[in-house]
Structures are given as structure tokens and as C-alpha cells.
Amino acid sequence: MFNLIRRSAEWGGKTLVLESGKIARQASGAVMVSYAGTTVLATVVTGKTKEPVDFLPLTVQFVAKSYAVGKIPGGFLKREGKPSDRETLISRLIDRSIRPLFPAGFYDEISIVCNLLSYDTVTPPEVTALVGATAALSISGVPFNGLVVGARVGYLPSEGKYLLNASADEMLCSSLDLFLSGNEDSVLMVESEASELSESQMLGAITFGHQHCQEVINLIKEFSHESGQTPIDFIPHDISSLVSDIESSYKEDFSLAYSNTIKKERVLKLEELRGKVLSEVADKYSAGDVECSDQDIVTALKTFERSLVRSKIIDTSSRIDGRAFDEIRDIEIEVDVLPKAHGSALFTRGNTQALVVTALGTPQDEQIVDDLDGDRRENFLLHYNFPPYAVGESAALRAPGRREIGHGKLAWRAIRYVLPEKSDFPYTIRVVSEITESDGSSSMATVCGASLALMDTGVPIKSPVAGIAMGLIKEDDRFIILSDILGDEDHLGDMDFKVAGTAEGVTALQMDMKISGIDIDIIEKALLQAKDGRMHILSKMNAVIQESRNRIKNHAPRIESIFINKDKIRNVIGSGGKNIRDICEKTGAKIEIIQDGTVMIYAVNNEAVEYAKSMIMDIVTEPEIGKVFEGTVVEIMKFGAFVSFLGGKKGLVHISEIRNEHISSVGSVISLNDKVKVLVIGIDREHIQLSMRRVDQESGEPIDGELYNIRKNSFSDDSCGSTGGSSFKESYNPNSRHGSHEKKRSGGSSRSSRRNSNGPNYYREDLPSSNGFGNNNRSFSNSRNGHDVPRKPRFF
């Protein structure tokens, strides 16, 4: 029933298996790829387009199934829906790797779908998916010029060792995360982020990865040969005579148009000429005997324009705007351009302009990413917006597409390394790049603008980051590398090579090809030329702002973290969240408590942060003998007053500790809700004894000698309101039916000396030793039961 084809090989210490003929047999080509514990089903379907087109309608979709890791999708529908950013980025990696290998003029519709069916969270799924896509193309019959394989490369600088398809844990120690694809002879695509690596280290990683791709290319060759499927013979339509006719009639006009250095004028003139060519050539051929379609004319015109611009550059080293091959366009930089933004910068390079804005948020603003590798929180976001007006087009605004997501991720990679650690700067950082003009290299303008905006915000980045886009014109063995390419040079050239980094090294690298790859020598030259351009741009940036501002804007949110004892977390929260709600309502701050005792305070200004901080510290601070606090009278009794302080702690001010002189009634001196200053003079577990008379109620300072007397343990019974030198110790039980005061002799037993179950007993504190506060846990013999129990501190 099944015509099963199977091939396997060891690659990077793991087993790679290719299978076909069993699943998805209705597709033009289908391959099940297993690499270690990761399995991808790659399918290719091709067919004729409904209408003639002059481009390759290639669609690549990478779909990560939740069941691949045994998960059920979140959300109401509980099924896969809109592609995640990661799925989009992997789809782009595959597309950019294989697109250059289709023959020119082949315009059949091609759909490639890579379903991630099983994922071990260790093996890179993008590597497995690209192998599957290439293998499926090789047995689909689609004309495809060569085989392409991808590899993920890491680097351990301490060992000088490169890693192949390493696990996520291994990559944690890596200073490089690079994905590249290549065929037998050359490199086709690179996407990477790095920790300020040198150009030679980056080149070494590319060489290392390309060498290891050859092992799998040979495996796919064997697999394809066994299938017996050969690509169809594609013979492109011959339009050479049409190209010659256009060149002879319109070369001068197009040469003049392309010599205009002002993009807006150049674009308008070129559009006018193209319309003229399409009309006149169509009329000419319709009157003759030679059949010529509109698609043929468009293709011939593109071929002519490409040849015209490329030959001028490679023959004369003269570019469209008159610059030298390594010359950077004029740069203008402004910072702090938006007064209410937390940070902003306007970066203009020629006719490319990016308005980059930074917003700071709290950790509660972090993006929650639901990923197959596990949910995570992202505190750095970079969004890239490319509206139609940036290139003078009239079109509706749409949601971010693959291009916007890809460009934003490249800039994110370039900036991430220089950001401070979260422990040093706990803010959530969002950077938004609004491309207001575009004539090439808008993603690298985003990198420069993001670095400037972050410094304007006051984010303490390690170093400024700049980016530059390089181009390539290659004809046979002749080639020229262009610095800071224009949009037309990108469109008509052979390579888009973007490098971002600091003065110390590379932080991001991206390369896309329009031809079937380039060798390592060209990549090396491009890297070195890009370094010179990057240093030039950094010098322009440093002339405006060299380092981050030493403080964030006044209207930016404030964040402060404090550490409390883990045992005090429940006190801060309070019963049913009462305390923490009270703090938030009174201060306007947001509070986040982490299990390790870290308390994060978020507020719109410093005053709110300090207020919330003081309220929290009041709750968690333990009262100390000899310390003065401000409190509120919450209850008045015959024998004294209860005062609430330190976020709800209660202590008793005995009637003898309210005033130095005798008072007959507590209520005649103080009232409920009075704000008073109190001195802690004794502590017995939860019971706190306070004094008002020992504190200056105006200044809050202890009265001269009183603090010394407490610490020297020199209180007399007379000063506490007892009789002479009596050995009687007073205790108070507010619920006792025997009255407010009961007396017992030291060491004696009485019914009132025992703690009453109906309410707490308050005892005069034992006199502390001369060098401390005494030991309240000393034991004595209880004559009632004969057991030693902790001695109760006496109540003053």
C-alpha cells in the first residue's frame, strides 16, 4: 500500500531521518523529517496561477502544533489560530533560504507547509523544517536549482568553540545565536544575534555552519535519487529580442531618470517611463506578427532596468545617487523630539527616516509569550511600523505583516545585548520605530534610532549601537560591495547584507541573497567594509548623545524594590488583601510581592513610591525598645490608651505614662484619633508598652535622659505608678470580673496571675540587664502545676 522511502544519518551527534511515501501522498512532495525528538511534516504543492504574474508566488508556512509538546492551546477556542511571531519568523527563514534557487521566469504557484508535529524542546525546529522543505521540493518535480540546508551555530568564546544545533540549555552559555542556510557551494541566508563578537568570529561561525550543511545535502541527494522523481524541464520564454528593442529605444531616457539623486523625482519619472514603454511596445507588437504578452513586456523591462543600473555601477563604480561605493549618506540626528514621550529620537540618513520612541512600563506590562518551549515573560519589546506614506503610496493601514515582524525582530536582536540586567533596571521597555521615509535600510535606521531613544530615556545601555545595510553587484567574477544601499540598489542588486553592532563588535547580522549564494571571501569583505561604515555612523551619533542620561524623565513611572522577611508577606497583604488594597488606594501605587520577599512598588511619581514604601516598612518593621514612633489613639480605657502605629501594630500607653503629673482620667488628656508620639519602653511578644510622657510631643525626640534611663534599666517602681519599693507586680486583664487591677507577689500564685482565656494579660516588664534589654524567657517554678514556664514580663 505504501511505497516507503527512508534514509537516515548522524548529524551533530543526533539521528536525522527522512521518510516519504506514507503520509500526505496527495501533495506534490511530502517528507516526514525526524531529528532527535523533533518531527516535522513538510509538504509541497504546486500549480498554475489563475492569472499571469511576473513574480514567483511562493508561500511558506511553518505551523507549530500545541500537541507537539503535549499542550492544549489557550484561549476560548482551544485550537491553533493566528501565527505567532516565532512561526512567522521561521516561515521567513525557510522562504528566504529557498526563494533564490528557483529559476528565473518560473512563476507557478508553490505552497510549502511545515507542520511541527513533535518537539523535544531541545532540537531547533527551524533546522528540521528547512531540511524537510528542501527534501520535499527535491521529490516534487518542481524545478529547483540545488539543495539548501540550514544549521544553527553557537559560540563559546572562553573555549573558542563553535556549537552545532545546540540545545537551549547549551545556548545559554553561548555568545552567538546564528542560523544560516547554504547549498553545496555557497551561503544563501544568515540571521543572527551576538554579544559584540568580532568580524572574524562571525565569519568563523558562518564557515563552520556551512561546512556541516554538506553532510545533510548528501543525505537529501540519496533520498531524492531513490524516489526516482526528477524536476520538470523548465525552459523560460525567450524575451532577449524584446529586451534589445527596449534598450535601443529607451536607454537614454532611463539613464537620465536613474541619474536623478532625488528619490521622489526619480520614482515619478521612472513610473512615467514604464507606462510609456508598456503602451508603445504593446502597440508595436500587436501590429506585427510576433506574439508578445503584457507579462513578457513587464519582464523584459525589469531585465533591461536591472542590467542598466548594474552595468553602470560595476563598470564605473558610480552609484545611482553619485556616491562612492563605500560612502554613507548624509546623517541628521535629533533626540528628545517628543516632549511627553519617555524618550525619542529622529534619525535621518538620506531619504530614509525613522522616528523612534521609547515607553517605560512596570513588570506588570511585560509581554506574556505562550510558546512551545514554555510560557515566558518578555520585558523588552521593539515594534517596527512601515506605513504606505513612507514610500509615497496611497493605501490603507494594515496590521503588521511578515516584513514588519522580521525587521522589528532584527532590530530587537541588535539592541538586546546592550540593555541592562532586569535586576538593575526593572522597567518593561517598549521601543516603537515609525518609518516616516524609506529609501533603503529602514531596519538599520531603526537600530540607530532605538539606541538614541534609549539613551534619551535614561536606560543605562552598555554602548550605543549602529547598523548599516550593504549591497552587492556581481557579474561573473567581477563584483562590487556597496555601503548604505538605496532602495533601488537593494531591488536591483544581488544581496542585502545588514550588520549592527557597537564600537567593540557585532550584535546582529542578517544576509539575504537574490542569486544562488556567495562564497566566504565576499562575506568577509562585506563584514570589514560594514565595520568602517558602522564606526562612521557611531561617530555621528556620539556627537549628539554619547551615553544614557543619568535619570529618567519626571513623567516616566517610578519603580522601587525593597526586600522584606518572607514571614512578613502575609502581614503586608493583610486579611483578605486588606492591607495591600489600603496601600494602593491611599498612594495610587501598584504593589507586586514576590515569594522570595521582594516587594516591587510602581507609581507615577517619587512621592507615591516613598509613601507606599513607608507604609510597607511600617507594617514589616518590628518595634524596638528606645525607638520613637507616631501613632493614632484607637481606644481609651480607664487604665490607659491603646495606640496604633507601624501599620496597625497596637501598644498600650499606661495612664502613668501619659503625663509626668498625676491625671485622674485618660479621656481628659487625649481623645480618639489623636496623633501622638510614643516611645517603646517594653515588649512582650505581641504586647507593646509605650510612653508619651518620655517624648517631646512637638519634636518627636525623647526627653533628655529618658532614653538613657530605659537602656540603663533604671526605672523605679515609683516612676511607674506603683507603691514605693513594693515587690507587688501589677497585671491587667480587661475581661476580668475582679476589676481592673490585681496584685500578686513575685513567685507567688494566684488565680489572677494566670493568663485568662477571656482576654490577654499585660504585665510590667522585667528590668533588663545593664548591657541589654534582658531576657524575657527566663523560667520560674509555677506552684500550681510544678512546671517551669516562661516568666511573664511586667507591665509598667
UniProtKB/Swiss-Prot annotation:
Gene Ontology terms: biological process? mRNA catabolic process; RNA processing
GO CC entries: cytosol
Gene Ontology MF term list: 3'-5'-RNA exonuclease activity; magnesium ion binding; polyribonucleotide nucleotidyltransferase activity; RNA binding
- Pfam families for the chain: KH_1, PNPase, RNase_PH, RNase_PH_C, S1
* Low complexity compositional bias, start-end: 717-728, 747-759, 769-784
The record's EC number reads 2.7.7.8
Question: What Gene3D superfamilies does its record include?
Answer: GHMP Kinase, N-terminal domain, K Homology domain, type 1, Nucleic acid-binding proteins
For the region Disordered, what residue ranges are annotated?
Answer: 717-796
Which portions of the chain have biased composition (kind: Basic and acidic residues)?
785-796
| Residues binding Mg(2+), per UniProt | D490, D496
Q: Which family does the entry's similarity section mention?
A: Belongs to the polyribonucleotide nucleotidyltransferase family.
Matching entries from SMART domains are given as:
KH (SM00322), S1 (SM00316)
Sorted keywords for this record are: Cytoplasm, Magnesium, Metal-binding, Nucleotidyltransferase, RNA-binding, Transferase
Q: Does the keyword Cytoplasm apply?
A: yes
Q: Where in the cell is it found?
A: Cytoplasm
The UniProt function text for this chain reads: Involved in mRNA degradation. Catalyzes the phosphorolysis of single-stranded polyribonucleotides processively in the 3'- to 5'-direction.
* Reactions catalysed, as given in the entry: RNA(n+1) + phosphate = RNA(n) + a ribonucleoside 5'-diphosphate
| Residue ranges of every copy of the S1 motif domain listed in the record | 626-693
Family matches, as InterPro entries: ExoRNase_PH_dom1, ExoRNase_PH_dom2, ExoRNase_PH_dom2_sf, KH_dom, KH_dom_type_1, KH_dom_type_1_sf, NA-bd_OB-fold, PNPase
Q: Which cofactor does it need?
A: Mg(2+)
HAMAP family documented for this protein: PNPase (MF_01595)
Q: Which residues form the KH domain?
A: 557-616
Q: What is this protein called?
A: Polyribonucleotide nucleotidyltransferase
